[in-house]
């Protein structure tokens, strides 16, 4: 054996990067025999001897790698010669498919070959043909090619034989077998996926690998700018989807990012194994992908068409500090910091857990809405959560006067001065101009003016703001000399400045530098004096005040001009003090804090962390007061209010917007010490957090930032206050910063958008210590680790949400419920109450009373009774109709007992317990055998378990549909029941939605001239969604607080969207967070009760007396006969247009398919239409295939339990099966076995497996009952039905068309229909109105024109066989304008069109509409002047 040939093969295998394990297994005894090179054609042919025939996957990998490696040099072909030429049948079958795939065949022959798996026997490949001609053709096309192919893959000794089989059944048998195998493979894949989904705790042992091993170095995604033949990338998968194609193949679509850019990666499956692997590609994985970059034909942008994808491990940031030396982050912002932070509370806590941090604080801006999620995450990950807030602290009032003295304001002399400086910091900046005027009796009696030399070049900002240039100050006196001269000149007069704290800060700092005492003169601040005297102004800047008071201001931001203007301003303000009877300097601060002074105080950030349970409650009070009592632009917290509720709360100094940091930066250490005395601990943050201050010219360089931080640390040591290093975290990782930049950039008025944002990721212990290396290792460790742990240890374990349900207490509720139930039962069923009724009542009452739910029922009963007493029916939602106690207390009209007859007069009753009747409403009419009167029919056969669970211990969720007109009255009635401080609207949190985030991303890209790939846009959109944007209120949810508790025991409160004019206060927490703690009453508004009330008013009929089995009414659910029209006339095959629940196109199609004739069948339709995977692909196919009829299919969730119990299954198992099926969890094998034992048909079992969500029967019953009542009016009182429909349900009208009648309406419908998806939203909404208008006109009714003196503001009025439209049906005329017209006409006849427009406040467009349609016929354009 020639050793050199083996070496050559070894080098070749290394060159093409063949995996070592493949070389060892299949090439150890192989050698490269020769290479034929055809230079002219650029073709190389390799001849390689191998030990055995290669498995197909290895062959494919080797062949592909060989071709790819030499692709730029030559076209490569390969011949393998195997010593052992045996090939396992499984491999030869795969090789056969590969051979066919690369062989040119006509579609007909390809299908014939691929439709069969050839038999392998005695080194022969046996194919089947249908006749001799076909066999000959196949052999001719394939025999020689197959022989060559076998030689090339290992000199295989196989030959091709074609056998003629005329037995078509044999061919079909094979196809069936192949289809079955394919189906089994699909089922296996689905089952494996389901198993993985159910058992996510057991990860796959092997990382994902599709295709060949990738050893290429990846490029960064931002380098992809053009099409490429072969590149490798790696990235984080943020979206993954698998699409099943009609060809039977699967398409994997990945969106991945490496945070330089993102790209879409596509891959087609090559076989069933690929398809199975595709399902395991998940969001959150890191992958390496190799393939070509090409322009995607669908997105028209660059994407990767991958050949190989492998899951990879990418090292993440870890906290490598020892367990006892890890920091605690005490200052974080989450997605609940409004439009500011982009990390969720759960993600923050999870990251802390990954790093081994024992605790983390949540301190969102002004709110605590992140607490519940953080709490749950803390429990899940074993991390102690500290609950806090970054509040906006304001002084109750800013002093008008300083150094108060007994000085007469009218007689004294004032020194009104102004300084121009190099910056805002009295510590690091200096005075460059000082000017002043002396004022006495309103006249300027002296002036002082001087520049001062700063001894450095002025910044452009200073030059632009002040107009002072370097030339003006270079030869000026020293600052010290200017200050000495001014000190002498000012004497003991009263000092005055506009925003005196700034000017006095520079003055006193300057005095101290020349060893003078601080000025002890009395001081007046004209800024605060103006705020006190002129509160009506929007701002109190000097130029605004001068303009308002007609004072000349020649050159703003030059000291002498500002001083003169301030002097005249002062005197005008002093004169106004006369009205307040204020004449002495000592009296000025007596009025500090008046006129909502908190609105004028500048907010400072401060951190509040609850230390105890009492502290948590106080925190909730403080958040509530800030939102309810002191909201102005942001929730503000007056210092006195914080002081009052400070018990159990730690107060920290917060960030650069905190007053301690600002005082240290701009004033003096002495003043900073005075300010810091208010706080419990001092926060310092990484220098990077403050670099934006340089850009804002608040500090000059980083060394000043470090100096301030050193001073703060020293101040803490001096005052014995704990100093902690905090991160002011707004996102997890540095690459997440871009999301925050986009959010901030979307807010034009946000001051953060004007400057570069600081870096505020969640830092590890080492990263944080490195930030403070300038303090020395010991001090850095102290503030980063020791002090944060010490502060954490001082805080109790606290839960922000309560355990258990706290319901309001109504004395005697339990007995009252019993009395109500039995009194009603006796009234309906007589005495003695039938045992079946007693049994059901006792079963329910035992659960309701035993679990403390009686009061919940009783409250609902009182609300419903109030509505009924006021003349409005109430519809129930959800499963409350499953409760017979709810029926007997009149909470619901749905009766869940088995179908039955009962006599209203003598109480004779008959119950059907065998399941033979589905709904009592479908029982045939029958006279009472006792008294001969007609029997009442009732009962929907709904088990109680579907409402409160099998044990009856589930908290009842009673949803009630009140009329939309009555809903506000029902809400306010709860205040009467419980008191105004015990009821609140359930709060909601509105977050940035995907569409909104998309707008932000595109806007950000446009503003910054970025061009993003679609995948990158999608990534950025994901990063911006879920951030708190606003707050709101649940449409009907009322939260009730027990009388022995306060709302602050559970949640803070606020106004919805911070609207202080709102009638209701809401819970600060999203109501889902406290759903299990406080009773929520769902007092919802709904159109059905409003329509019923209007029909009642128009007809005088009691809706409760409307029959539920009217024959003509039932006909409209399967045809149009009872409406007196044909389907062709109204373009609809049923008569249910406008009937709630049954008027949509989807449900109308269901009605056409099923043709229901009974109330029970309508219940099934309702259930089918609201469920998921209950009708489509399930019940619809069962009915169409004739397997069962509509009454047999599963419609509502309760049907399952009732059906299985009738079949003989144990009630507990029947309930459990129902619960699993309705939630889309399918069936367990043991349940299927039990169902089959009790003769449950296979189709029923398969139907259960497909269902994803099911509608409760009680809900369906309540809706259908309302629908049947309304349908009754449509059939028997049509004009009333149309009046009610158009008044209550319709929003869009086209009166021009509707008035013209059927032909015009039909034409307009066709116009809109032809547009399809191009129709506007308004046109799509209009379509339904036009369809019902057409039906109305075809039934012989018509629309009139709007009448100026007869039309209602909002209601369609019946006039014979016509409807008179209201004013708000006019396009562009809203309800308020409509009400204004009616109100104006009540005051007298309109004199002219001008008079109409002026008195009713309608627009010119609306006036023209009324005029063009003859509504203003004979009316003059303008008022006529009458002469007497």
Curated annotation (Swiss-Prot):
Decide whether keyword Phosphoprotein is in the record: no
Disulfide linkages recorded for this protein, renumbered to the chain, are none
Which GO terms of the cellular component aspect does the record hold? cytoplasm
Q: Kindly report the protein's main subcellular placement as a broad class.
A: cytoplasm
Domain Exonuclease intervals:
414-570
GO biological-process terms attached to the record: DNA-templated DNA replication
InterPro entries xrefs: DNA_pol3_alpha_NTPase_dom, DNA_pol3_finger, DNA_PolC-like_N_II, DNA_PolC-type_N_I, DnaE2/DnaE/PolC, DNAPol_HHH, DnaQ, Exonuclease_RNaseT/DNA_pol3
Keyword terms = Cytoplasm, DNA replication, DNA-directed DNA polymerase, Exonuclease, Hydrolase, Nuclease, Nucleotidyltransferase, Transferase
Q: Where in the cell is it found?
A: Cytoplasm
Q: What's the catalysed reaction? A: DNA(n) + a 2'-deoxyribonucleoside 5'-triphosphate = DNA(n+1) + diphosphate
One Gene Ontology term of the molecular function aspect: DNA binding
What Enzyme Commission number(s) appear in the record?
A: 2.7.7.7
SUPFAM superfamilies attached to this UniProt entry: Nucleic acid-binding proteins, PHP domain-like, Ribonuclease H-like
Q: Which HAMAP family match?
A: DNApol_PolC
Q: What protein family does this chain belong to?
A: Belongs to the DNA polymerase type-C family. PolC subfamily.
What does this protein do, in the record's words? Required for replicative DNA synthesis. This DNA polymerase also exhibits 3' to 5' exonuclease activity.
Q: What is this protein called?
A: DNA polymerase III PolC-type
